[in-house]
UniProtKB/Swiss-Prot annotation:
Catalytic activity: acetate + ATP = acetyl phosphate + ADP
Binding residues for Mg(2+): 8, 382
Molecular function terms from GO: acetate kinase activity; ATP binding; magnesium ion binding
Quaternary assembly: Homodimer.
Its job: Catalyzes the formation of acetyl phosphate from acetate and ATP. Can also catalyze the reverse reaction.
Protein name listed in UniProt: Acetate kinase
GO cellular component, one term: cytoplasm
Originating species: Bacillus anthracis
Keyword list, A-Z: ATP-binding, Cytoplasm, Kinase, Magnesium, Metal-binding, Nucleotide-binding, Transferase
Major localization listed first in the record, in broad terms: cytoplasm
Length: 397
């Protein structure tokens, strides 16, 4: 048995989960927030109880030291020697990484170089990797990329209709995101269906504050809704999803905003927040719709209609689907959104059962038994995928 830590480092946060592998038992998990501020928050679960501490954590290295100290102090590990591997979520692997990889100096340099493609995320991921290297330099560390799963997309899916030299010179193409989540739920769907993954055509709907749809054929991603960045695709909590690109200079002209300001609006003030004017949270918006709020209704209609566009086109691409999967915060917990997405899809063999659909955050088939297309709710588990890859690549036993 080996203990493996899965790490997700943000610019001012560090999310962690410690597994006993290969049993996949979660020993503890937690979150360090507001790193760099005087009132940083450190939360860890010990024996099922959440412990919370507000203290000054100036940087990620201090956060890592504090985390490791808490593991030994609470007897979760007897000594740090028990930690056999570390897995780091890295948002962007570009075309360089089609799989998770053992971190070397060269790999770390490549990840830093790819920061151009993910300026908000990759630098933070690198900081997390370096912080652990300082404290546990001899423990195998693995980078698990959000983009890697989508590297199987054909050129017809990943190329934009732009001058080809933009792709050759600047790497401008669709990359796709949420890959670790889409990989986990499609592999789990094959297990639940009792069929080989290689024989299945699956639609994976990762619906959270960020949302993406993936077409997965034979276990390989053949298309996905996010693009060069996670701004593309369906309408999201605060992100616009696809818009006419000519709108950007038009908005600049009308508002006097810079490119950076307009892109910030598209990322942080658009989507459901932009449409409603008051919230990016679907629970708030559904409650407002029930009170008769017109903009809430319109926002929900837009959200669902954009998802339908991808379901329709990806079903055509795969010449039919075996199952539709719902995952992530909204996909796992909102029966109302699932119902609206599934309504009217009988033409493609989708028959959902409203009673079975009444599930929240647990695995369930929500289709009628006679439905040719199965509908499955699967809570995602990106952390366990990270731990599995550390076990696979880290030569840990």
């Amino acid at each position: 048995m080996s203990k493996i830590i899965a790490i997700n480092a943000g610019s001012s946060s560090l999310k962690f989960q410690l597994f006993e592998m290969p049993s996949e038992t979660v020993l503890t998990k937690g979150l360090v927030e507001r790193i760099g501020l005087e009132d940083s928050i450190f939360t860890i679960t010990v024996d099922g109880e959440k412990q919370k501490e507000i203290t000054n954590i100036p940087d990620h290295a201090v956060a890592v030291n504090m985390l490791l100290k808490k593991l030994t102090e609470n007897g979760i590990v007897k000594s740090l020697d028990e930690i056999g591997g570390i897995g780091h979520r890295v948002v962007h692997g570009g075309e360089k990484f089609a799989d998770s990889v053992l971190i070397t100096d060269e790999v770390l340099a490549d990840i830093e170089e790819l920061s151009d493609l993910a300026p908000l995320h990759n630098p933070a991921n690198v900081v997390g990797i370096k912080a652990f290297q300082e404290v546990l330099p001899n423990v195998p560390a693995v980078a698990v990329f959000d983009t890697a799963f989508h590297q199987t997309m054909p050129e017809s899916a990943f190329l934009y209709s732009l001058p080809y030299e933009y792709y050759e010179k600047f790497g401008i193409r669709k990359y796709g995101f949420h890959g670790t989540s889409h990989k986990y739920v499609t592999e789990r769907a094959a297990e639940l269906l009792g069929r080989p993954l290689e024989s299945l055509s699956l639609l994976s709907c990762h619906l959270g504050n960020g949302a993406s749809i993936a077409a997965v054929e034979g276990g390989k991603s053949i298309d996905t809704s996010m693009g060069f960045t996670p701004l593309a695709g369906v309408t999201m909590g605060t992100r616009s999803g696809n818009i006419d690109p000519a709108l950007i200079p038009y908005i600049m002209e009308k508002t006097g905003q810079t490119v950076e300001e307009v892109v910030s609006v598209l990322n942080k003030k658009s989507g459901m927040l932009g449409l409603t004017g008051y919230s990016s949270d679907l629970r708030d918006i559904i409650a407002k719709e029930e009170e008769g709020d017109h903009r809430a209704k319109v926002a929900l209609d837009v959200f669902v209609s954009r998802i339908h566009k991808y379901i329709g086109s990806y079903t055509a691409r795969m010449k039919g689907v075996d199952a539709i999967i719902f995952t992530a915060g909204v996909g796992e917990n909102s029966a109302i959104i699932r119902e609206r997405v599934l309504e009217g899809l009988e033409y493609m063999g989708v028959y959902f059962d409203a009673k079975r659909n009444n599930v929240f955050g647990e695995e369930a088939f929500i289709n009628f038994p006679h439905s040719p297309v199965k509908i499955i709710v699967i809570p995602t588990d990106e952390e366990v995928m990270i731990a599995r890859d550390v076990l696979r690549l880290g030569n840990i036993g």
